[in-house]
Amino acid sequence: MNYHTYFGRESAPVECCIVGTGGFGRSFIAQSLKTPLISTRVAVDLKAQTATDVLRGLGIDPSRIAQCATASEAKTAWENGHYIAAGDLSVVLDLPISVVVEATGHPEAGAKHCRLAIDAGKHVALVSKEVDSVVGPGLALRARNNNVIVTPVDGDQPSLLMGLVTWAEVLGLDIIAAGKASEYDFVYDPKQRTLSSNGKTASAHDFGDWIEPATLDLSTIAARRSEIAAEFPQRAVPDLCEMTLVANA
């Protein structure tokens, strides 16, 4: 795929608002500072000061950052070319932003943010799988009725799996199963005969017998490996959320 067919040299930057300035949000702003066709001048968190601190930490001149508590303040700051830090999404929804990136990871707050954004005519990039797995289909319908889009973000495991499955279906292949990697890796040490995961190590004397087992029955192999690794959590909430996204797709 040639991305220049989607983003021509004369394209205007997409104006974004990030909601949630934690790990993902901070990284998104940092990347947008280096990406010509993405502009993220608006950051929202529980406290405007939190968003301000993130913007400053990314090297943005403090004199160019405005903390805004009202829509009027946000409008003035935008017109003056400032970055905007707010503690309430509703304060910034009248600005000429095209996409709200929801990255709080909080189910109730995230659902509210999506509803507000959709009703304001903004597209939503829904990073918070905790939201998408519960109310994603409903949000998608609401967005469709408002002529905007709600979408998972490309590059995360759910979107990659959706792409792989639909690619296979277009080729005419029958999909009999789909899965994803766990949040944590399991590392087997054949010399010590131990299994390690997420900072914990445990004895796994029989695990080596199931690396290249004599049986080809996959269900038996998976069950035995799971039994040997019983001391470790093998499913996490993010795993379940992400697979629900794929199932809903």
PLM feature spans:
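Short, hinge-like loop/turn segments at secondary-structure boundaries
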Residues: 58-62, 143-145, 168-170, 193-196
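Catalytic cores of large soluble enzymes that bind and process phosphate-bearing ligands
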Residues: 16, 20, 43, 131, ...
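Short acidic, glycine/serine/threonine-rich loops at helix termini
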Residues: 55-56, 136-139, 162-165, 186-193
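N-terminal glycine-/serine-/threonine-rich beta1-alpha1-beta2 phosphate-ribose binding loop
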Residues: 1-116
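Active-site-lining helix/loop region of Rossmann-like oxidoreductase modules
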Residues: 166-249
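Rossmann-fold NAD(P)-binding glycine/threonine-rich loop
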Residues: 104-120, 127-156, 161-167
